[in-house]
């Protein structure tokens, strides 16, 4: 199957993860945030998310947006290490270790004060504390349930993966898992059914490559200037 995007660390596929995953190598880890209840959640609120350019159109909801995806349960045994955000919506096996995001929300009635991720790890519960208002900085959310980059990077840290591990996100969205994996030196594969998100994720990965190259170039320029200054000083 031809990738939608590919570089040295990241591969993105546009398609149904149920069809794409059998064609892929077995990953070392799965880190994902599958859709659940988006259709119901967003239809009554005017259709706009806070600090976001994303706008929900109920007519665009996928069939699984109004109910949990049953195939998500199969992911629990699809890799040696698995993290599934929203795992409390699924009939997943009992686990000792949940990842928790404490959003530090003061509102006790209308919004969740925390989010939960099911894991298959044999460790105590782990808590990530960051106010939702601070989690995204100046970045616009491009997906309704987009997780903060810092949160996904923390997930990977807590998983204690081997260097160069291969991470799969079958519900990639805007590509935050892939970005976090790339920043930590891991390889990753992302899949999404919506081509818009494949485009957004590919753009984020390409920008990272460009930023890295510009950073290396700038560093070389600075080092060159220092070298010239040293020669002049002598």
What is each residue range found by the language model?
Residues 18, 69-70, 148-153:
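Short, well-ordered alpha-helical scaffold segments within catalytic/effector domains
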Residues 15-19, 220-221:
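Conserved SAM/SAH-binding loop
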Residues 1-7:
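Short acidic-hydrophobic surface loop/beta-edge motif
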Residues 9-15, 213-216:
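Conserved SAM-binding strand-loop segment of SAM-dependent methyltransferases
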Residues 23-32, 36, 40-62, 76-234:
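Class I S-adenosyl-L-methionine
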Residues 63-75:
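A short, well-structured juxtamembrane/interface segment
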Residues 11, 20-23:
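Amphipathic alpha-helical segments that form coiled-coils or helix-hairpins used
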């Amino acid at each position: 199957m031809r990738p939608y995007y590919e570089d040295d660390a990241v591969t993105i596929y546009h398609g149904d993860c149920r069809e794409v995953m059998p064609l892929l190598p077995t990953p070392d880890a799965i880190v994902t945030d599958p859709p659940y209840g988006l259709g119901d959640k967003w239809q009554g609120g005017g259709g706009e998310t806070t600090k976001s350019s994303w706008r929900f159109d109920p007519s665009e909801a996928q069939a699984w947006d109004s109910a949990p995806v049953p195939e998500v349960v199969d992911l629990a045994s699809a890799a040696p290490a698995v993290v599934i955000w929203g795992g409390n919506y699924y009939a997943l096996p009992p686990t000792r270790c949940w990842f928790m995001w404490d959003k530090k929300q003061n509102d006790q009635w209308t919004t969740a004060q925390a989010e939960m991720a099911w894991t298959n790890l044999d460790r105590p519960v782990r808590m990530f504390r960051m106010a939702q208002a601070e989690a995204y900085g100046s970045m616009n959310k491009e997906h309704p349930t987009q997780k903060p980059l810092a949160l996904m990077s923390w997930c990977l840290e807590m998983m204690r993966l081997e260097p160069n591990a291969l991470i799969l996100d079958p519900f990639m969205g805007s590509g935050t898992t892939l970005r976090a994996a790339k920043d930590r030196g891991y390889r990753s594969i992302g899949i999404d059914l919506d081509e818009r998100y494949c485009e957004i994720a590919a753009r984020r990965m390409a920008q990272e490559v460009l930023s890295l190259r510009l950073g290396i170039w700038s560093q070389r320029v600075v080092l060159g200037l220092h070298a010239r200054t040293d020669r002049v000083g002598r």
